Amino acid sequence: MAQEGVKWPKPLVRLNGVALIDRLIDVFLKNNATSISIIVNEEMTEVQDYLKALRLPIPFYLLVKSTPSSMHSFYELSHYLDGDKICLTTVDTIFKEEEFSGYIQQFIQEDKLDGLMAVTDFIDDEKPLYVETDNELYIRNFLDQADGDCRYISGGIYCLRRPALGVLNNAISQGMSRMRNYQRQLIAEGLRLKAYPFSKIIDVDHADDILKAESFLKS
């Protein structure tokens, strides 16, 4: 985004005057997170300084490490996760707060699930990951290309329970990378995953996404 004239590193990009990272932390606090862990790559020194100055009312872990993929970032963060319930996302994933609250509530209530994955039928992604579900929204597969039945794509928000971390360790030891391959591995190892539809989820990848995201949040 710097090449497109955006002056901030992505976590500090403002939407309606609020930095992406502040918005995300605030949403997690409002939904009763018991701790927050953030990984930042080594080049983002401005973001590191910004986060080091934060004071939160719950335990806050900041990990500075550059990794080859988002799955590796999750693996590095997983060492800081002590509870049974995890919600994972990236800083550029924009969603409606009230939908996120409903999502968290369903994950807590459906305690037999190994994972509840945010999905949307709003497709504005360069390389979407299609999510194949049954009639009850249990996930059958994750696909790079849509087949006839795929209504949803991955929204990039993941609620997971402890068994999913075992699969993560297996995926790393097998040399896998990328979150989409990890998600396929969750299915391959027989974990119970369900999809939770959001009306719309936007990724802030480019400068013109900032205005789109701002108007979406105001709508």
Listing of model-derived features with the role each one plays in the protein:
Residues 6-9, 27-31, 38-43, 54-55, ...:
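A generic "structured core" feature
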Residues 12, 131-133, 195:
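A structural signal for short hydrophobic beta-strand segments in well-ordered beta-sheet cores
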Residues 23, 46-49, 72-73, 167, ...:
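Phosphate- and divalent-cation-binding pockets in alpha/beta enzyme and binding domains
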Residues 108, 138-202, 208-219:
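Catalytic-core segments of class I nucleotidyltransferases/pyrophosphorylases
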